[in-house]
C-alpha cells in the first residue's frame, strides 16, 4: 500500500501533522470541512500566495486561524501589511467569521516537495526541457541534504502524440517505511499540447519517534 497510497495521508498522525486542526460534531463537521476547502481554494488563486506550499487551518471559539507556509513571506505580507490585511478581509467575508492569518517561512525551499513540483511545472510551461528541469531540481534537492528524491512527469511529454510517464530517482525513498519522513506533492503544467502532471517525493530522513509528528524533529536515515 505504501507504493499506491498518498505518502502524506499514509503517515498522518504517525510522522505527519494534520493540516486541519479542529474538532466538529455531526452537525458541524461537514460545514467545517467545506469551509476549509473554500479557504484553501481561495488562497491558491491569490497571486500573493503563489509561492505557498501549504495552508494549516485551526478553529477556536468562533475564530479561524490560517497559517500560510511560504518561501516568500514578503510577497504574502505585502507593502506595510496591505496584502495580508486584504486576505483577512476576504476570508472574513467568505466564512462570516473572524479570521487571523499567520505566515510561516519555509527556510529551505529545496526540501519542500510542493515548491519543487511547482518549480518544475513552471519551467515546463516556459518550454524548458522536462528532463533538464527534473535533473536540475533533483540535484538541488540532494545538495540541500535530502536522503533521497524521486520525480515523475506524465502527459504528452515534448509534444509526443502518445502520453507517457518518465521518472528519475536518486538516493533512498522508502514509501513502505512509516518512520521515514517522506514529503510528497503534485503540480500541473499547462502547455499547448495539454496538461503535464508532476509528482515529487523527498525523503528527509527518519523520525526518531511517533511523538515527533507534533514537533517535526527528524534524524538522519541510516545509510
UniProtKB/Swiss-Prot annotation:
Disulfide bonds: none annotated. Keywords: Ribonucleoprotein, Ribosomal protein, RNA-binding, rRNA-binding. One of its GO terms (cellular component) is cytosolic small ribosomal subunit. Pfam families: KH_2, Ribosomal_S3_C. Binds the lower part of the 30S subunit head. Binds mRNA in the 70S ribosome, positioning it for translation. Belongs to the universal ribosomal protein uS3 family. Part of the 30S ribosomal subunit. Forms a tight complex with proteins S10 and S14. This is Small ribosomal subunit protein uS3. It comes from Chlamydia caviae (strain ATCC VR-813 / DSM 19441 / 03DC25 / GPIC) (Chlamydophila caviae). The gene is rpsC.
Amino acid at each position: 500500500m505504501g507504493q499506491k497510497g498518498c505518502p502524506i495521508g499514509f503517515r498522518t498522525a504517525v510522522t505527519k501533522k494534520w493540516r486541519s486542526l479542529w474538532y466538529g460534531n455531526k452537525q458541524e463537521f461537514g460545514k467545517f470541512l467545506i469551509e476549509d476547502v473554500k479557504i484553501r481554494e481561495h488562497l491558491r488563486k491569490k497571486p500573493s500566495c503563489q509561492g505557498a506550499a501549504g495552508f494549516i487551518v485551526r478553529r477556536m471559539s468562533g475564530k479561524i486561524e490560517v497559517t500560510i507556509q511560504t518561501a516568500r513571506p514578503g510577497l504574502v505580507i505585502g507593502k506595510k501589511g496591505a496584502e495580508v490585511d486584504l486576505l483577512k478581509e476576504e476570508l472574513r467575508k467568505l466564512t462570516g467569521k473572524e479570521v487571523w492569518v499567520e505566515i510561516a517561512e519555509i527556510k529551505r525551499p529545496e526540501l519542500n516537495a510542493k515548491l519543487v513540483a511547482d518549480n518544475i511545472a513552471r519551467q515546463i510551461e516556459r518550454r524548458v526541457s522536462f528532463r533538464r528541469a527534473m535533473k536540475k531540481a533533483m540535484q538541488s534537492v540532494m545538495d540541500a541534504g535530502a536522503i533521497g528524491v524521486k520525480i515523475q512527469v506524465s502527459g504528452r511529454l515534448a509534444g509526443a502524440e502518445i502520453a507517457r510517464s518518465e521518472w528519475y530517482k536518486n538516493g533512498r525513498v522508502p514509501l513502505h517505511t512509516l518512520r521515514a519522513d517522506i514529503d510528497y506533492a503534485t503540480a500541473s503544467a499547462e502547455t499547448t499540447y495539454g496538461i503535464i502532471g508532476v509528482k515529487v517525493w523527498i525523503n528527509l530522513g527518519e523520525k526518531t519517534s511517533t511523538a515527533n509528528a507534533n514537533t517535526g524533529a527528524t534524524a538522519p536515515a541510516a545509510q
